[in-house]
Amino acid sequence: MSSPLGHFQILVFLHALLIFSAESRKTQLLNDNDVESSDKSAKGTRWAVLVAGSNEYYNYRHQADICHAYQILRKGGLKDENIIVFMYDDIAFSSENPRPGVIINKPDGEDVYKGVPKDYTKEAVNVQNFYNVLLGNESGVTGGNGKVVKSGPNDNIFIYYADHGAPGLIAMPTGDEVMAKDFNEVLEKMHKRKKYNKMVIYVEACESGSMFEGILKKNLNIYAVTAANSKESSWGVYCPESYPPPPSEIGTCLGDTFSISWLEDSDLHDMSKETLEQQYHVVKRRVGSDVPETSHVCRFGTEKMLKDYLSSYIGRNPENDNFTFTESFSSPISNSGLVNPRDIPLLYLQRKIQKAPMGSLESKEAQKKLLDEKNHRKQIDQSITDILRLSVKQTNVLNLLTSTRTTGQPLVDDWDCFKTLVNSFKNHCGATVHYGLKYTGALANICNMGVDVKQTVSAIEQACSM
């Protein structure tokens, strides 16, 4: 029979053991938190820059895309202080919007406009502010709230741009375009100044592959995905008279195929379990890159980043933890639902004519705008042919309208020549990114032939004064 003293000694021992275990567990928890903190420190901060580069109601889809992206980032855990939004902000409360204060990105979709910060709006949405924001140059921005990317060598940056594009450039609603060479030089400056750890760029625009092809270096820790290659259009979706259509009262396209593919994928998936490469293939299949009539999603830059999880850039939504992926999600969008972005302004005006009472002032104004737009396009088509003939001193110049360089080469070697001709074409011929600037590839061909720049500028002035 054991003594009371023996029982007491056992109890003391067990008590000491419990205290030791508790302290050990506490120490382990503290160590685990230290490791977690260390990991977070190593990962740094996630920054995002979102740019809708257009204005006017018929371009509804670009601001819808950007607003949708913002909602994904916020649900993913990014803070407003680390998200910078560029958008003209003329859609939500446009007199043409039948749902004031609301923007949707898909039929029967929820409002994506609510809560979106207005960092840079109206004339502040321009290329100079865009570059200065990326470079963290607070003194260089004008208008807006002055927010810039204050990133460092441990931070990851996500850039998403949605708008019109053309060979060698993407648009802004005011001022100059974002030229491919200039943009890549900004990225190289950011790398040299150690402004980031890794960067992901998504670009929704026609001929968007030309922004990086043969230009973006592979050693910058930058991974870029474009809606189209350097030679083709991207596509609008959820458009009137297509399937599935938008609510009839909205009257224009709600989204773009590339954009809604990555956005809707991100809405559903657990981003901590999906890699950049996996999303690339999901988006590529949904856009229908295997079908000749659609655009071909392209990727450029640092290939070793393909295994990175999307959560490192756009965060993760805890609500998606139990999502089960199904291949049906990545099925191609029906061709019947696609519209060439350069035709969307025409479609928009046609819809206005159909909806307006016959003979009304609204109907007559829309008919006049439609006729003017069609005539302007015919004039641009003729002007570019005349420019080519006058520049290269040849009569058969049709091949210069469509010929492109070998895959992997940049659009042009002499970017100063290219920018000069593009600006001249805009100023003298009224070419805009909505239509006329689709011919910038032909201007690049002139530069690549070594034709004198002054001679071509003179040809542009002459052709557009006929």
From Swiss-Prot:
InterPro entries: AE, Legum_prodom, Legumain_prodom_sf, Peptidase_C13. It is an enzyme of class 3 (hydrolase). It catalyses: Hydrolysis of proteins and small molecule substrates at -Asn-|-Xaa- bonds. Disruption phenotype: No macroscopic phenotype, probably due to functional redundancy. In plants lacking all vacuolar-processing enzyme isozymes (e.g. alpha, beta, gamma and delta) shift of storage protein accumulation from normally processed polypeptides to a finite number of prominent alternatively processed polypeptides cleaved at sites other than the conserved Asn residues targeted by VPE. Delayed cell death of the two layers of the seed coat. The record marks 253 as: Required for post-translational maturation and enzyme activity. GO terms for biological process: programmed cell death; proteolysis involved in protein catabolic process; seed coat development; vacuolar protein processing. Its main location: secreted. It comes from the Eukaryota. Disulfide bonds join 239-253, 417-447, 429-464. Its EC number is 3.4.22.34. GO terms for molecular function: cysteine-type endopeptidase activity. The active site is at residues 164, 206. Keywords: Cell wall, Disulfide bond, Glycoprotein, Hydrolase, Protease, Secreted, Signal, Thiol protease, Vacuole. Glycans are attached at residues 137, 322. GO terms for cellular component: extracellular space; plant-type cell wall; protein storage vacuole. Auto-catalytic activation. It is found in: Secreted, Extracellular space; Secreted, Cell wall; Vacuole. Residues 1-24 form the signal peptide. Seed specific. Restricted to developing seeds at 7 days after anthesis, and, at lower levels, detected in flowers. Detected in siliques, specifically in seed coats (at protein level). Strongly inhibited by biotin-YVAD-fmk (a caspase-1 inhibitor) and by Ac-DEVD-fmk. Belongs to the peptidase C13 family. Asparagine-specific endopeptidase that may be involved in processing of proteins targeted to vacuoles. Probably involved in post-translational proteolysis of seed storage proteins in the protein storage vacuole of developing seeds. Exhibits a caspase-1-like activity in extracellular granules. At the early stage of seed development, required for the formation of the seed coat, by regulating cell death of specific cell layers in inner integument. This is Vacuolar-processing enzyme delta-isozyme.
